[in-house]
Structures are given as C-alpha cells and as structure tokens.
Amino acid sequence: MRVLIAGLMASVFAIAGVSAAQAADRVDQVPEAPVAQEAPVKPAGSWEGFYLGGAGTYNMGDFGSDRHTYGFGGQVFTGYNWQQGQIVYGVESDLGYSGDDVSSGGVENKYGWNGSVRGRVGYDMNPFLLYGTAGLAIGDVKVSDDTSDESKTNFGYTVGAGVEAFVTNNITTRLEYRYTDYQSKDYDLDSGSFSRGYDENSVKLGIGVKF
C-alpha cells in the first residue's frame, strides 16, 4: 500500500513539473507588442514643401522714352521647394496688380494685373535662403485717349534675385528684386495707332507660410 501511495505521489509531482515547464514556455512565447513607427519629420528650418504668401511691391516702370511711371502694387504667390543638402530649387507663380500709369501727348498708358511662372534656385544659409529666379511674365497694358481705349495681354520674361529668412519654423519673410520686360504691341485708338511695350524694375517685400 505504501508503495502504491508513493508511486501516485511521484506521478502527481511529475505531472505538476511538466505543467509548470509548459506554462513557462507559454509565458516566454508571448509576442511583444509592436513598436509604433513614427512618420518621418522634416528637420526644423527645412525649405522643402508647399508654401504661399503675399507681398507689397514698389514698381519703376517705363512705357518708352519720356513715359516713365512709379507706383505701388501687391501680389500673392505660391510655390513648392525641394531641398538636397544646402541646394534649394523649386517652382513659383504669382498674381498681382499694379496701378502704374502715365500720360503723354494726350494718351494714357496703364499697367494693370500681372503674373509670372518661374523657377527658383537657392543656397540655404539657415535661417537665410539666397536665391535667383527667372521665368515667363504676363501682364495687361491699357492705352487710351479721350474717346477710346484698348487693352492687350502682353507676354515677356522676368529675372531677379532675393533673400528669404525663417521667422518661425513655418513663417518666412522675403525681400526680392525683379526686372520684367514685355513685348511691344500696337494699339489702335481714335487719335491714331500707337506701339507700346512695358518694362519694369520692382522691389517686393513679402511674408509666406510653409506647409
């Protein structure tokens, strides 16, 4: 009888030992919780990405000899930058209005809405960006006399350079100079036919927001 009881107790301890070992294995095999992968974040001060803004402009224009004009205007701009190391490049467009006008010989010449599509290439000197820009320009030139007027859309080119700086991680300010030259066109008025082009030197002070 004692031999039987001893055998039963040995069997119980053996089963308990096997169960404990299996439980330990199951604990060891509990999968680890997945680690959340953070989305890549652009470093602070990066110029890469979409942006938009606005600028005030001071324009010094010329409709031809003795037809010089000076005035203020404004524009909105938007664009996208890519950045590789310290080289920044991208595309930018703007749309603006300028009330530049001058009268000569009974004929008034006026430069109105205008815009451009340009490329930009710059060098990052964080927090400053020095850049150059060039592209296609489009603008409205209106010529009128006492009894008639005619407006035409003129195309040309624009080139310039500027400096832009971070105010915060997503707010920038810029100072830019541009020269724009439009083609000449003929305007037929009651007082005669007139050929007019327009070229302009402008200084632009603006503020932008990066996204």
From Swiss-Prot:
The gene is ropB. It holds the Pfam family OMP_b-brl. This is 22 kDa outer membrane protein. PANTHER family: BLL7405 PROTEIN (PTHR34001:SF3). The keyword Metal-binding does not apply. Gene3D superfamilies: 2.40.160.20. It comes from the Bacteria. The keyword Amino-acid biosynthesis does not apply. GO terms for cellular component: cell outer membrane. Belongs to the Omp25/RopB family. Disulfide bonds: none annotated. It comes from Rhizobium leguminosarum bv. viciae. Residues 1-23 form the signal peptide. SUPFAM superfamilies: OMPA-like.
